[in-house]
């Protein structure tokens, strides 16, 4: 990888340095950055670093990150799940449908909302039933995004 300073900063002992490095790397378009972001998303002990890695991966829209993002939508911290879902929506394939549908029942409404958006982008008719159930969600934003997703599916 020719981004040696980025590698060094991504592994810095200071969490704040790693956290800011992730966001900075989102602004660079070199392919060599995506593996650095994926590694941090998968392995960093700080949820804030993992969240920022997901945010940066959304900016890259690189399908090679989909495996890592798919794992991260099961992260213990809701913000990591939310932003990983948002990034995954940019590189979606139907193989992630079941994982995304499960997130329509997440404890956090932001995660449920992102799942509805992702299902709309995915465009699979298999999402219709779960999206219809989300029309009764307690959170209005989830209901709105579920309705929009259904409209994208011509329902």
Predicted regions and their residues:
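Short inter-helical turns and helix N-cap capping residues of alpha-solenoid HEAT/ARM repeat scaffolds
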Residues: 13-14, 45-46, 76-77, 107-108, ...
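Amphipathic alpha-helical scaffolding segments comprising HEAT/armadillo-like alpha-solenoid repeats
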Residues: 1-11, 30-42, 62-74, 93-105, ...
């Amino acid at each position: 990888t020719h981004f040696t300073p980025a590698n060094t900063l991504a592994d810095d002992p200071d969490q704040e340095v790693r956290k800011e490095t992730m966001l900075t790397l989102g602004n660079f378009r070199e392919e060599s950055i995506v593996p650095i972001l994926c590694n941090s998303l998968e392995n960093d002990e700080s949820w804030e670093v993992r969240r920022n890695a997901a945010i940066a991966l959304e900016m890259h829209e690189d399908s090679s990150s989909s495996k890592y993002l798919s794992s991260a939508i099961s992260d213990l911290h809701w913000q990591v799940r939310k932003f990983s879902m948002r990034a995954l929506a940019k590189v979606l394939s139907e193989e992630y449908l079941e994982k995304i549908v499960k997130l329509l029942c997440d404890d956090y409404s932001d995660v449920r909302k992102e799942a509805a958006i992702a299902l709309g982008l995915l465009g699979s008719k298999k999402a219709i039933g779960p999206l219809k159930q989300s029309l009764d969600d307690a959170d209005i934003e989830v209901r709105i995004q579920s309705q929009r997703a259904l409209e994208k599916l011509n329902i």
